[in-house]
Every structure is written in C-alpha cells, then in structure tokens.
Amino acid sequence: MSKYIGIFVFVFSLFSLGVHAGESFRFRVYLKDKGDSGYTLDNPEEYLSKESVERRNRQGISVSESDLPIAQAYLDTLSANGGKPVLESKWFSTVVVSSPDSLVAERLSRLPIVDSVKWVWKGDEEIDIPREEKDTTRFMPIDKPEKSPYGYAEEQIKMLNGIKLHEAGFKGEGMRVAVVDAGFMNVDRISVFDSLRLLGTHNVVFPGRSVFIGDDHGTKVLSCLAADAPGLMVGTAPQAEYWLIKSEDSRSEFPIEEDYWTAAMEFADS
C-alpha cells in the first residue's frame, strides 16, 4: 500500500508543478521596454554589420530605437527567474524563454520589467536526426539537358519576364538575398548549386545545427533563384549572394513560428 501512496504523491507533485516528463515549455515574454543595453544610435556599427549600415545609408534608412538590442540585464533577470532565453526580438521587445516548468510564466509575469507572458510552444527540446556526415554522396542530374539554356526553369522565367533582364546583364550580381524557409536539405550536395555564392547559413529553430538536413522546401525555392546549370535549370538570380536561414519547425504548428520568422528577419536585416 505504501508503494502506491508513494507513486501517487510523485505524480501529484509533477502535476502541481506543471511539469510533464520529457516536455518543455516556451513562453513569449513581452517587455515594458528594452532597458539600457549600453548601445546608442550614434554608433550603429557596434550592433549592426558593416553591410547593414552601408545598405541603410545607400537606401536612406535611418537607424532607430527598434535597432537597439535588448539589455543583457533583462535577459539575465528572466534567466534568474527560471526562464532560459532562446529567442529575442529587438523590434517587438519580446523574449522567448524555455522552461520545463509551465508555472514559470506566472513568476515572470510578476517581474517589474515584464508587461505580459504568452505560451507559444510545448514539446521535446531534442529532435532532429543528424545526417551521417561521413556520407559524401553527390547528387548529379539524371535528366537530359533541354534545348533552352534555362532548362526546366524556362516557363517560370518567361512568366516573370526575366529573360530580358538576363539579356540586359541583370542576373543578381552584387545583390545579397536571404532565403528564409523550413530547411535546405542537401543543397551542399546537389550539383546545380555547385556555383552557389553562399555567404552563410543560420538555424533559428535549432541553433548550431545544419540547415542542410530535414525539410527540403527551401531547397526547391533556392533552385528557382540560384540554380546555375545551363540546359537543366537556371534560376532568376544565379549571380546573387545568398544567406540560407531556417525559420520553421516543420514537425508541428505553434505560435512560436511567429518568433522564429521574426528572428530570421532581424538576423537578415542586421
């Protein structure tokens, strides 16, 4: 009998703490302001890249308060109260925090720096099955070249009237493009991307993990832009430079998708 009482007490404790084995919770914390980060509008190069500053100067876009980062002291306060910061938005003054305790939201909402707290996700933190990196397989085209140099992209580029732009010399040279999508599976192995001008990758959803595994929707989108295999497929901007940013967890649909997308936009803009 005592054994069953012990089990009951343990299970009751889990539910009373808002904890479910194997689950984690994420909450969007709306801050009342961003605090004093130590940065100023007079020195944007301290928190924006050189390219971002130059683009703003070229396009007449002024640096504003929305560009200033959230104060580290605010992030530390959230962390000290049980919410581990995993995403932040300087544009909206929000921070997404992670915790195994669903009741952390109530504690955070009482902090003087916090305006409100919203639940945005729950699930297992560990996911993703990593690709076997020892596999160096290259994916070569099996299709026969088409008569048109644009190959399978001919109808698309005709529809966009892009051939005239290419004939005039506009193929994306000197432009930087951020492709924000759910994943770019095998872009690093598909031969039509051998000439891809890749500036870098960024994984908003699973920081530090490759964007070249998992979902392939971004691969398809990128092929319409950057593929450069005459006779097979030539995209609309094969000479542009690209950032590939993973911003979606395709396993599920939760409000945190808004935070992922915002983080991707802010990364690209900065």
Please state what every model-predicted region is.
Residues 1-24:
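Bacterial Sec-dependent N-terminal signal peptides
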Residues 10, 101-103, 161-165, 227-229, ...:
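Short alpha-helical segments and helix-capping/turn motifs at coil-helix boundaries
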Residues 21-138:
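Inhibitory N-terminal propeptides of secreted protease zymogens
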Residues 22-24, 40, 153, 163-258:
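Subtilisin-like serine protease catalytic core
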